[in-house]
UniProtKB/Swiss-Prot annotation:
One of its GO terms (biological process) is histidyl-tRNA aminoacylation. GO terms for molecular function: ATP binding; catalytic activity, acting on a protein; histidine-tRNA ligase activity; transferase activity. It is an enzyme of class 6 (ligase). The lineage of its organism: Bacteria, Bacillati, Bacillota, Bacilli, Lactobacillales. It catalyses: tRNA(His) + L-histidine + ATP = L-histidyl-tRNA(His) + AMP + diphosphate + H(+). Its main location: cytoplasm. The keyword Ligase applies. Keywords: Aminoacyl-tRNA synthetase, ATP-binding, Cytoplasm, Ligase, Nucleotide-binding, Protein biosynthesis. This is Histidine--tRNA ligase. Homodimer. It is found in: Cytoplasm. Its EC number is 6.1.1.21. GO terms for cellular component: cytoplasm. It comes from Streptococcus dysgalactiae subsp. equisimilis.
Length: 426
């Protein structure tokens, strides 16, 4: 049997991994500017953590979760999204305590798992960057978090990003709209897809989010949720819009956007861009003021977003964005003969300890093959080390582009390689 990776997973090899590391690094730097700290939660959770928070009737829970019973007969699931585990951790670790400064701002980067049909930018194991902010009901928190995502996309060089915005209102306005939507959709129930017929009974707002053609036709003239906002909900949404305008962040109102998870209220949003004449969501999130309480904590407002790393990298590639990934070695050491093996090892370590990236030959190859490796690795400087160099206590350094050479002592290399390197590559 030929062993291969499971369907819907990927091996991220070193060249690609460098791009991942760059994007993750830019995200970390951006989040730090907004005073976010990293949190790392387990890759698996108790089933109830996800099912109760995400919603028993969502596609994630009914169709997409990897869940199983462990040897202790505990119902476990691989995490399909990041918010619920972070909220569970927030409550379990009592980050709501008065001595903890509010708002609590956290970000995460890690693997998520959903059993779905693999396609471009969508896998069964995928990677997500997300942020969660706890303790502020201020609409400025909504806008700051949206602005942080917008700032990240600007730094990465993504073009043509559009912010789609909607409000689900509070519990009262959402309940009023839910009934209005049921009244609107019920007469055309038979024209809906099978999934949306089920959603109409369980969670009618999810019909608005359907990608099926017949459902899109059915909801084309559906009542707008914004017409059912009470005074509190309207004031919150008006404040969000005015603050976005103050920051010159353009947006469009999308009243059919409801998000795929049940815990949202008030502001929800998506950032969308076009790739190959198709719209792709890069990032999505919103406000969830009841989730901490649902997990047994005190009533605590929350706001956050998540974005898929695979999809983000796909968009960067499709848009032709060149990521400034560092390539190549600083130094390649060509080793001539077994007698030079120990000296080469010592020299390699001495240069590395001074902050340089170094590789050497371990295979005892001819000098021509070693120089070819130096070219392949894009080494800036090549050091040739053989029996004569060891006897003299000196090494020959060559600029790998200009081919200019210089001879320096081992002592100089071991104590002040930075000066030698700068002189060699100037």
């Amino acid at each position: 049997m030929k062993l291969q990776k499971p369907k819907g997973t990927q091996d991220i090899l070193s060249v690609a991994a460098a791009k991942w590391q760059y994007v993750e690094g830019v995200a970390r730097e951006t989040f730090k500017q907004y005073h976010y700290g990293e949190i790392r939660t387990p890759m698996f959770e108790h089933y109830e953590v996800i099912s109760r928070s995400v919603g028993d009737t969502t596609d994630i829970v009914t169709k997409e979760m990897y869940d199983f019973y462990d040897k202790g007969d505990r119902h476990i699931t691989l995490r399909p999204e990041g918010t619920a585990p972070v909220v569970r951790s927030y409550v379990e670790n009592k980050l709501f305590a008065p001595e903890v400064q509010k708002p609590v701002k956290l970000y995460y980067i890690g693997s998520m798992f959903r059993y779905e049909r693999p396609q471009a930018g969508r896998l069964r194991e995928f990677h997500q960057i997300g942020v969660e902010c706890f303790g502020s009901a201020n609409p400025a928190t909504d806008v700051e978090t949206i602005a942080m995502a917008y700032h990240l996309f600007e730094r990465l060089g993504i073009k043509g990003v559009t912010l789609h915005l909607n409000s689900l209102g509070n519990a009262a306005s959402r309940a009023a709209y839910r009934q209005a939507l049921i009244d609107y959709l019920s007469p055309m129930r038979d024209t809906l897809s099978k999934d949306s017929q089920r959603r109409l009974d369980e969670n009618p707002l999810r019909v608005l989010d359907s990608k099926e053609k017949e459902d899109k036709i059915a909801v084309a003239n559906a009542p707008s949720i914004l017409d059912y906002q009470d005074e509190e909900s309207q004031a919150h949404f008006d404040a969000v819009r005015s603050m976005l305008e103050a920051l010159a962040i353009p947006y469009v109102i999308d009243t059919n956007m409801v998000r795929g998870l049940d815990y949202y209220n008030h502001t929800i949003f998506e950032f969308i861009t076009e790739v190959d004449q198709s719209e792709l969501t890069i990032c999505a999130g919103g406000r969830y003021d009841g989730l901490v309480e649902y997990f047994g904590g005190p009533a605590t407002p929350g706001f956050g977003f998540g974005l898929g790393l695979e999809r983000l990298l796909l968009i960067l590639d499709k848009q032709g964005v060149e990521l400034p990934v560092e390539e190549g070695l600083d130094v390649y050491i060509a080793v001539l003969g077994a007698d030079a093996n120990v000296a080469a090892l010592a020299l390699t370590q001495a240069i590395r300890r001074q902050g340089f990236t170094v590789e050497r030959d371990y295979l005892g190859r001819k000098i021509k093959a070693q120089f070819k490796s130096a070219d392949t690795f894009k080494a800036k400087v090549v050091i040739t080390l053989g029996e004569s160099e060891i006897k003299a206590g000196q090494a020959v350094l060559k600029h790998n582009q200009t081919r200019q050479e210089m001879t320096v002592s081992f002592d100089q290399i071991q104590t002040d390689f930075a000066s030698i390197f700068a002189e060699c590559v100037q």
